[in-house]
């Protein structure tokens, strides 16, 4: 039964950098729609695990299955197409672009027109562009940011930039969303709002979430594993 198969199955994962073992014997299984927290002190290798799961680093040993499919030998963009999206500790937005255009960067993968259509603006291009804009506003509505759609991303408050980065990751329609310290730099009310947002993401998008977080109130509030 596909629904019972884990979305992420990691076995005995490890990586060495020169003579240094950064991660060793790491095992993790995440079911569909689960929210799981990865906690530990700084330097414990949590972000390295995220880099292994997205094939930024190739593991020295062990295996990773995404929805039953191995990631070994895949490029990062191929792992993304398998259904894995992530955010980063340090916000990585196109700060000169508008909020909605940042989301459209994520949506671009699913757009169904070729280069010729986009260059000469064939009807197919406009149809896809309209769909893309509608989809972006759906995300903005969920995050209560529709009124900021045409605001320059770099001028947003810190908490809103964090939410935008999550929206851009969701735009790729992932099965598994990796959040690297999503509450970093947020005040308590922003963190409480983020907690509700992550829960809503899981429920509305039908996806699993794995997060690295130091804020234990957030971890204890939403994580099931």
Language-model-derived ranges and their functions:
Residues 1-225:
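Glycine-rich phosphate-binding loops of nucleotide-dependent enzymes
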């Amino acid at each position: 039964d596909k629904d019972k198969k884990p979305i992420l199955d990691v076995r005995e994962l490890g990586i060495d950098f020169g003579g240094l073992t950064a991660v060793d014997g790491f095992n993790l299984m995440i079911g569909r729609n689960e929210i799981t927290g990865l906690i530990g002190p700084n330097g414990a290798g949590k972000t390295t695990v995220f880099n292994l799961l997205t094939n930024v680093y190739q593991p020295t040993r062990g295996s990773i299955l995404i929805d039953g499919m191995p990631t070994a030998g895949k490029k990062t963009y191929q792992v993304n197409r398998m259904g894995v999206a992530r955010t980063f500790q340090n916000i990585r937005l196109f700060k000169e672009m508008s909020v909605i255009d940042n989301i459209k960067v994520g949506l671009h993968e699913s757009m169904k027109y070729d280069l010729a259509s986009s260059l000469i603006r064939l009807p197919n291009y406009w149809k896809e562009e309209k769909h893309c804009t509608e989809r972006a506003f759906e995300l903005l509505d969920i995050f209560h940011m529709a009124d900021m759609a045409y605001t320059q991303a770099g001028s947003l408050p810190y908490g809103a930039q964090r939410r935008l980065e999550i929206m851009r990751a969701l735009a790729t329609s992932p099965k598994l969303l990796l959040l690297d310290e999503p509450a970093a730099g947020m005040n308590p009310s922003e963190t409480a709002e983020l907690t509700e947002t992550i829960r809503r993401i899981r429920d509305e998008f039908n996806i699993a979430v794995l997060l690295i977080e130091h804020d234990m109130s957030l971890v204890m509030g939403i994580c099931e594993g």
